[in-house]
């Protein structure tokens, strides 16, 4: 497969993360990086066990080996089991490297760490690229591009995000969020707690470990890979969007994409009130809070403004026309939600999520809200004295609130922003500024492709069950920049699939399951499931 060279590389950067050492340069040809995780020699002796990980854990599910027709896959399974300690250590090192896109903490170092992963995998071309200034006026974070030409018949594009959310409640963590400590969390004997463990470093490292295991056993991968990793997913993929649109030839040779499937829409805005724009209250800076007796408060007015945007429950958006363009669910989508609701325990799900209860107690309604709901959230608000406890009289001159709108077909982000502007003007808030942080449109897709069918085969093999395939386009998926690959720039079949996982994304004590239990596989199971899906897609698990 032919390579695509990109435009801008970063200068020399040396990164030390735990036992990880990488060196990257600005030359056209990416330098070889120091081997840091697994031996170069195929089937080399594994590292001495240090963690005592049980690959199977207490998982009650069984892999149906009668469906594994290629003996090479069984060898890969054995390799994963033998090396699971080092695979978990790989994930720990990855979590220990902060990569917080909204603050910039560790972003540059993380980009080069990702490039090191791709170099380690044997990709012939790897590059860290600066997309430049985005359409929203912000500097993009680096993207990392790699081509792994295995001489295979099929080529798979692979989506990665290397950024995470910030740590917003450090006191609630059971262990430091960048320590990647292994702890017991019933029913699981071993999970890793850390920022990014579930979203999405655990899955990414499982994919990487699986590919490294295949290479160690077989010497090459069943498919060619084109990686493109972004550092802006938690910033609405603003840099990724620019980079993909600026480089429309990147994935022309890709047959499919390993990614998250369909996607809801999401637009983020900030609403900004100030005494200067209002013409009342403090104008230049905060003033003494005692002056409230004689001076208007922009902050109180902002709170009153927010109250006009939703109903008394906070669950229905009151912006005129907000719901006008929504397309009703199809019969196929209704059936999917009904099936998902059959085995859905509302109370258990709420407890695992860390909420007292859902808006509805009906399993079907909760599934529908989760996968086809619309909302306006208050993500954060700040002004004045933001120190918990104590005192300190402040009358703020400026207040900012951050909001995300989740939307579905045929709503659009720009239309929602326009309707928001009209609502504010109608209610006398012409001075309130709207700052659009970013917009990720929804994306529809179906299961009618070879990768989706391969994933279905894998799930049957792993006893994970399968919903009926969807042969009409839907958006029953969470937010990610799928739209870029579903008609905006490319039109590629997209799917991914694995067993195992974690929880607590964006929350304190985010975790990834290392040793499974009950009907849940651990990390070894996830790696095996990914390897199996890749072999199935490549047509290398056919029954003779």
Residues of each region from the PLM?
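Bacterial N-terminal signal peptides that target proteins for export
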Residues: 1-14
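Bacterial signal peptide processing site
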Residues: 27-29
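A non-catalytic alpha/beta surface segment that caps or lines the substrate-entry region
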Residues: 90, 100-154, 179
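Active-site metal-coordination/substrate-binding segment of hydrolases
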Residues: 153-226, 519
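Fold-level recognition of mixed alpha/beta catalytic cores in primary-metabolism enzymes, strongest
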Residues: 196-361, 367-374, 506, 511-523
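C-terminal motif of bacterial Sec signal peptides marking the signal peptidase cleavage site
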Residues: 23-25
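An extended, acidic, His-containing surface patch that forms the Zn2+-binding/catalytic region
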Residues: 318-398, 406-422, 427, 431-544
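N-terminal hydrophobic or amphipathic helices/low-complexity stretches enriched
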Residues: 31-106, 124
């Amino acid at each position: 497969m032919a390579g695509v060279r990109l435009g801008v590389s970063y200068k020399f950067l040396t990164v030390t993360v735990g036992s990880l050492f990488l060196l990257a340069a600005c030359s056209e040809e990416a330098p070889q990086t120091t081997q840091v995780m697994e031996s170069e020699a195929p089937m080399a002796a594994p590292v001495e066990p240090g963690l005592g990980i049980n690959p199977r854990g207490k998982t009650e599910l069984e892999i149906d080996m009668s469906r594994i027709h290629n003996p090479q896959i069984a060898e890969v399974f054995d390799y994963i089991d033998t090396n699971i300690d080092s695979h978990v250590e790989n994930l720990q090192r990855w979590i220990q490297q902060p990569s917080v896109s909204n603050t910039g903490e560790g972003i540059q170092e993380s980009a080069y760490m990702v490039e090191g992963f791709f170099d380690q995998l044997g990709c012939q071309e790897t590059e860290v690229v600066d997309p430049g200034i985005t359409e929203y006026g912000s500097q993009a974070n680096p993207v990392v591009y790699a081509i792994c030409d295995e001489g295979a018949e099929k080529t798979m594009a692979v989506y990665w995000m290397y950024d995470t959310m910030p740590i917003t409640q450090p006191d609630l963590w059971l262990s430091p969020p960048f320590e990647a400590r292994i702890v017991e969390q019933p029913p699981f004997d071993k999970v890793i707690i850390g920022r990014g463990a579930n979203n999405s470093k655990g899955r990414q490292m499982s994919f990487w470990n699986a590919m490294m295991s295949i290479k160690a056993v077989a010497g090459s991968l069943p498919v060619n890979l084109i990686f493109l990793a972004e550092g802006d997913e938690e910033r609405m993929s603003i840099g990724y969007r620019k980079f993909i649109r600026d480089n429309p030839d990147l994935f022309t040779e890709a047959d499919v994409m390993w990614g998250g499937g369909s996607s809801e829409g999401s637009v983020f805005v900030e609403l900004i009130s100030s005494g200067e724009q209002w013409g009342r209250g403090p104008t230049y800076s905060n003033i003494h809070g005692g002056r409230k007796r004689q001076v208007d408060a922009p902050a109180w007015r902002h709170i009153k403004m927010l109250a006009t945007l939703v109903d008394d429950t906070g669950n229905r958006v009151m912006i005129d026309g907000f719901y006008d363009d929504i397309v009703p669910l199809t019969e196929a989508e209704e059936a999917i939600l009904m099936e998902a609701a059959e085995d859905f325990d509302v109370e258990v799900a709420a407890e695992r999520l860390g909420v007292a209860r859902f808006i509805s107690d009906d399993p079907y309604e909760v599934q529908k809200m989760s996968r086809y709901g619309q909302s306006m959230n208050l993500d954060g608000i700040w002004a004045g004295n933001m120190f918990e406890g104590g005192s300190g009289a402040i009358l703020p001159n400026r207040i900012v609130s951050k909001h995300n709108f989740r939307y579905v077909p045929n709503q659009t982000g720009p239309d929602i922003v326009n309707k928001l502007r009209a609502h504010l003007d109608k209610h006398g808030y012409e001075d309130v500024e709207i700052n659009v942080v970013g917009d990720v449109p929804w994306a529809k897709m179906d299961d009618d492709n070879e990768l989706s069918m391969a994933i279905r085969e894998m799930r049957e093999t792993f006893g994970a069950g399968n919903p009926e395939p969807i042969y009409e386009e839907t958006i029953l998926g969470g937010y990610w920049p799928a739209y870029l690959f579903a008609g905006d720039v490319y039109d590629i079949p997209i799917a991914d699939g694995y067993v195992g996982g974690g929880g607590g994304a964006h929350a304190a004590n985010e975790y990834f399951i290392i040793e499974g239990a009950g009907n849940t596989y651990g990390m070894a199971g996830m790696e095996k499931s990914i390897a199996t899906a890749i072999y199935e897609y490549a047509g290398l698990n056919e029954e003779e």
